[in-house]
Amino acid sequence: MLKCICRVYSQPLAQMVTSPLFKHMGSAGTYTILPITNLRHLSTKNCPLKIKSNRSEPLQFGDFERQVPCSRKSGSSKNVQKRLYELRQLKTVLSETFGVTEYASFFESLRNALHINNCSENEKKKLLYDIILHQHELYPEVARKIGFYLPGEVHRWFWYHIPKSESFNHYLFLLKSDVLLFTSNYCTRFTNRLIKGTEMERQLATFQIFLHDETNIKFIMEKVLKLHTFDSLIALVNGLVKAKNFRFIKVFIQALLQKLEQHCYSGKDGAKQKNLRYVKFNNTLLYYLLKSGNVELFIKTFQEELKFIVSSGLLNHIDGNEHILNFPIHHYLNLLRISNRQEELFNVISCLQSSPLMKYKLFKEFLMGELIASFQAFRDPKLVCKYLLSSYSSKASANILNALGIWGWLYHSKSTTLTAPTLARELKNKNNILPNTMRIGSPVTVPILTELYRSLLSSSSVSLESGQFKNCLLDLYYKYKSFLSEEAHKYRYWRNDTGILNVFLNYIRFQAREPRLAYNVLLDFYSQPFAKKVVLTTTLCPFSIVAYKNHTLTQAELSELLQVMHKNGVPLTFKFCSAMVMHYVKMRDEKGARSWYNKILFGGFEIRHMALIQIIKDQGWPFPKNFDETLLTELVENNNIKEPTDSTLFTDEDMFEEDGKPRFNDDDVNKCTNIIRETLKSLN
């Protein structure tokens, strides 16, 4: 029998708890969380929505789950039933305060539940859920004000025993139970899993799923502030900015500011910690201004931040806090690159190459990423390769390039794999063009390889005849596939993502003009054993590249794509759903088109794609809640709105967005470069 809190009460138990709680504790069945709609079948089933006044109904916090009794398994032992009963009576005595004693009792009960034998995993999960639910109901003020901390071993058990398909429901349970989200790495893993999942899962992990109804915003943001730490909220907002998901960004930035002001800074390091947090907040603000294209405010914020870093004395504490300079300078370099100001970018890098910042590997990787990406403007893959070999471990990187077939096409203009002695001899003739301070030392990374593939294929599409270019594409693809199967596991930091695959599919579809070949390559790639470990790290889905306006595909082939996506856990994206809507509209299948549009509505995707907006208007379909109606005005005023051209559609992440280059004048550039120089002098 579990120990009870050492406190004596004379009144009956029923008078000491609320009626709903007493009824719940006395019921015969346990409770579980079930979704109203099976989200995992989103790709194969229609998702009907109630429509009102040409708007889809907003989803409320309570719409996502309901509590229903679950019958016990007939095979449960009497011992397990006894334990269930004991735990269901857990600490039913309401204490007047909630402190160390109550938390110790709560923890003890959770740990006792973990150690129960002869109990199925599902029953144990229900036990843990019951304990947490009871705690939440017994101490509503604690839940409302500060939330509940769970021991790390409980989160660990959840991670290893809750099926991946139940992650959505589990996370929703944690939110409703006011469980602090970032007190365990295992809880963070659930967050990351959801962020990489379906649109609904991403919106749950970022709380956006509850924000479509404006009446929820205040309550939900209070929960965000309570359950998140400052650092975890920074990570969440940065993720939204990276995806250019700006729907609720101002609300989240306000929450960050509140979190910044709430923290109590004390002790001898109090001032330093306060300044460090301010810089972290400012870096997130800079990132948002960069991604949203607000160049004028970015320049002002950047200059003020560097001045503050110097004046506050934070440069004296740079070790262990190198991010305070890494991120603002990286954002500025990124702005120079996307503005096609290569000369200014090279000038800043020349200032940085002898600075103390070069001792930080992450900063050097940032630097090389921007430098190599800037070379795309020159269409010179050999130049990209020279810098790659000068920065990363030349021997290991050359071996990777040789195995991938890149070395052969780059330096021999044909498909060939060199022997080790021949490769070593050729590598010896490649001069190092970077100072030692900029050397990273580890093998080349996947993002840098992605840039090299883009540069090589861009150049080859011009220099090679059509048939030769197609052979080049297929040779590089098959060697890449072979490398992932046989070689990639040898490299510790290798990360299987879809970046390189997207490059292949883009050039096969839009440069070689082989849409059916792109379909076959995609299916071939996802038929490989390594495919299940490939992570979607970008907003661009390879299935969208193949499906969008690909009129060579039959209905059966599109269905096969969906099956492959489901089998490999590839979530539906807005781009894929939009592609399917357009496909069915072209086929004059209104029912099929509406079915896919319902998925867009149910997923809570933001709609800004003008061609899709035209379809919605023509079909008389409802627009989503919080739809930006100025886009309708723009549609009326501009009768010549067209879909993006196929040749440029998939060259970057912004499949359905105008690619406007941010512009700023020479005076702004000079001011920013000069303040970087002054900051580096202070660092020295």
From Swiss-Prot:
Indicate where this protein is primarily found: mitochondrion
State the annotated membrane topology for this chain.
Answer: Peripheral membrane protein
Q: Keywords, A to Z?
A: Membrane, Mitochondrion, Mitochondrion inner membrane, Transit peptide, Translation regulation
Q: Name one GO biological process term.
A: proton-transporting two-sector ATPase complex assembly
Q: Where in the cell is it found?
A: Mitochondrion inner membrane
Give the CC-aspect GO terms.
Answer: mitochondrial inner membrane
Return the transit peptide range from the UniProt record.
1-56
Top-rank lineage group of the source organism: Eukaryota
Please give the Gene Ontology molecular function terms for this protein. Answer: translation regulator activity
Function description: Translation factor specific for subunit 6 of the mitochondrial ATPase. Required for assembly of the CF(0) component of the ATPase.
Similarity comment: family membership: Belongs to the ATP22 family.
| Protein name as catalogued | Mitochondrial translation factor ATP22
Which species is this record about? Saccharomyces cerevisiae (strain ATCC 204508 / S288c) (Baker's yeast)
Give me the gene this protein comes from: ATP22
